[in-house]
Design a protein with these regions (language model features):
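N-terminal loops that bind phosphate or other acidic moieties
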Residues: 2-137, 141-380
Length: 380
């Protein structure tokens, strides 16, 4: 196979290698066989999940910063986010400040968790000149409709007696007025690009509370209470902003965080991989490639539902470029990916092994597999 340019666009291999390491290892394998005759372009990828911040940091030249914010139960914690100050870009993961994994199982109760810490991260980004904020909203512990985040940015929520409310899920039902007088004015110049891979509306049986409440600690009684409270909150949003966001796909994401971002800010909700495509200038970089190599830790039937390898493959097929996937393992029904642009898929596991051995030897196994593939291609 005549190869002049190869684009290597993998996701991370969970718990063993980040996407950059995967890309470097594949390049090393091909260089061992082809020498320096090929132009390589390594583009670390992610689909909005783990590794997204790293992929975007690589693309923008961003640096990670750590600040003190409040966790979902309003306790001080350290949380990190990334900034590329020269590009006025910030990359924030909601889970860093308001994530479910920050709470013990017995602490998880969406009646009392708040997204305030996410607002504090946004405020710190504003303090350093951010004009574009890329926000990943997966893995949240909250069902407060983004009111905690809004509070941290200056919005005031008051009850029927004019008393200021400290916002969490339970207090949504007590909102009488939303006052945006003190909302940080810098937000008028900010664009939010939100990595959101769910289409749930804000309310109802397919909405934020019913679908995601249980994993955040809500029982059925709590779910009914929270959904009613969320409906009341949405009525107040309409009065305050003139916008009805309930039926916008993704408004229910992250316990209603999507609704708050859509209602109050210049926001687009986009699939995580599409944000990575945009920031990395992916389409421009692949269109003259002779081969695209992608991969992920485990490829199976779920891969066809928006995961990185299929996203990369579908993009490559727009330019009629062949696509090879190299993965940590190939799971049940992985062959479905062949209907979505991937021409051939390989596992790096060559013999029965323990999980510990697989993770420990993943780099060498990847090098071996990629070398074998390079040898086959050179025969053609």
């Amino acid at each position: 196979m005549q190869l002049q340019k190869i684009v290597i666009a993998p996701d991370s291999f969970k718990e063993s290698m980040n996407a950059q390491q995967v890309g470097n290892t594949i390049k090393k394998a091909f260089t061992n066989i082809y020498g320096n005759t090929i132009n390589y372009d390594i583009i670390p990828m992610a689909d909005g999940g783990e590794g997204t911040t790293d992929a975007l940091m690589h693309a923008t030249g961003a640096t990670k910063y750590t600040v003190i914010v409040n966790d979902p139960l309003m306790r001080p914690i350290e949380a990190s986010y990334a900034r590329a100050d020269e590009h006025q870009i910030a990359i924030i993961e909601m889970a860093a400040a308001s994530g479910l994994d920050l709470l013990k199982k017995e602490e998880r109760n969406p009646l009392y968790t708040s997204s305030y810490g996410t607002g504090e991260l946004i405020k710190d980004a504003l303090d350093h000149g951010a004009k574009t904020i890329i926000l990943g909203i997966g893995g949240s512990a909250t069902n407060d409709g983004g009111t905690g985040m809004l509070s941290a940015l200056g919005v005031q929520f008051t009850d029927a007696n004019g008393k200021l409310l400290h916002m969490h899920g339970d207090n949504l039902a007590h909102i009488a007025q939303i006052d945006t007088t003190n909302l940080d004015t810098r937000l008028k110049e900010v664009t939010f690009k939100v990595a959101c891979d769910v289409n749930n509306p804000l309310l109802g049986e397919h909405g934020a509370t019913y679908i995601y409440g249980p994993q955040k600690g809500a029982d059925m009684k709590m779910i009914q209470k929270l959904d009613f409270a969320m409906s009341h909150y949405h009525d107040k949003i309409k009065i305050c902003t003139g916008k009805s966001v309930n039926q916008v796909p993704g408004s229910g994401a992250a316990g209603g965080m999507g609704a708050a971002l859509l209602a109050f800010f210049d926001t687009t909700l986009t699939k995580g991989i599409d944000i990575v495509f945009d920031i990395t200038n992916f389409h421009q970089r692949i269109k003259d490639a002779d081969l695209v190599i992608t991969g992920e830790g485990r490829m199976d039937y779920q891969t066809i539902f928006g995961k990185t390898p299929v996203g990369v493959a579908l993009a490559a097929k727009q330019y009629h470029i062949p696509v090879i996937a190299i993965c940590g393992s190939l799971g049940e029904n992985y062959q479905h990916v062949y209907d979505f642009g991937i021409d051939s898929a390989y596992s790096i596991i060559s013999s029965p092994s323990t999980l510990e051995d697989v993770l420990q030897n993943s780099e060498q196994n990847l090098l071996n597999t990629a070398t074998d593939i390079a040898r086959i291609l050179k025969l053609q």
